[in-house]
């Protein structure tokens, strides 16, 4: 990456300043060992949620609630975020972030469990936005479920879509990079999705459900 390009990326990441609530959520994420969405991708999530007026959203991978806060920022006041994580400690940290933000309890539904067990129980076509930010090996299954869950006009967002800049390099063939690269191709070629790959954060793959 050229110096100018790197500087532009840093500028974009810092363009929307994070407040103290988000910064504390990031600190808790670091303590728990989970990697939250980066600021540029988070800001993009807020914009996407606002653009589609997301009253019902699903987050796969709660972490410490950083991505959740960005989604809730863009959702209308009556919007409900369903967020799924297998780690109870993660959800406890996220609830702390929600309380600090003053988010009403009726605006979030936290579900503890394996996302691939939980997602099939959610209603077809009932969601405006699905955000994937969990174990990368399960990304193919998450994307398949997301397409089912989204209403026409709903938005899919997949974090870490460039995976430390490894995805664009065909010589990189480790398991994680290969899975994410294939997910990108699946979304790109899916007849029901209109996709774009944004260089925000560590790459944000987005698509609109036709």
Task: Identify the residue ranges that each predicted region occupies.
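A short alpha-helical cap/connector motif
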Residues: 1-129, 136-157, 161-210
